[in-house]
Swiss-Prot record:
Record localization: Plastid, Chloroplast
InterPro entries linked: Ribosomal_uS14, Ribosomal_uS14_bac/plastid, Ribosomal_uS14_CS
Annotated source species: Ceratophyllum demersum
Record bears the keyword RNA-binding: yes
Principal location listed in the UniProt entry: plastid
Alphabetical list of NCBIfam families matching this protein: PRK08881.1
Entry keyword set: Chloroplast, Plastid, Ribonucleoprotein, Ribosomal protein, RNA-binding, rRNA-binding
Assembly and oligomerization: Part of the 30S ribosomal subunit.
This protein's encoding gene: rps14
Pfam families, per database record: Ribosomal_S14 (PF00253)
UniProt name for this protein: Small ribosomal subunit protein uS14c
Family (UniProt): Belongs to the universal ribosomal protein uS14 family.
Length: 100
């Protein structure tokens, strides 16, 4: 189980990313449309003004039940450990274990 503070920090990053998403997207679009290099540098400086934690690359996918940041399956939103436990308990319909 992940510490509560780490999960809260991740939620804070998600909120910041949603808040500054439009600003980042519009700045990137402006950079691609402006032909002069000096204007591009100006817009690039504006792109660096939002908080660092508002960048989408700072986000991690976390397990829905445990908060584990690694080995997550996107389709289920769970870590591999919990996913295997749910497979074994037949809690995920349509999922079968491999056997050969």
């Amino acid at each position: 189980m992940a510490r509560k503070s780490l999960i809260q920090r991740e939620r804070k990053r998600q909120k910041l990313e949603q808040k500054y998403h439009l600003i980042r997207r519009s700045s990137k679009k402006e950079i691609s449309e402006v032909p002069s290099l000096s204007d591009k540098w100006e817009i690039h400086g504006k792109l660096q003004s939002p908080p660092r934690n508002s960048a989408p690359t700072r986000l991690h996918r976390r397990c829905f039940s445990t908060g584990r940041p690694r080995a997550n399956y996107r389709d289920f939103g769970l870590s591999g450990h919990i996913l295997r436990e749910m497979f074994n308990a037949c809690l995920l319909p349509g999922a079968t274990r491999s056997s050969w």
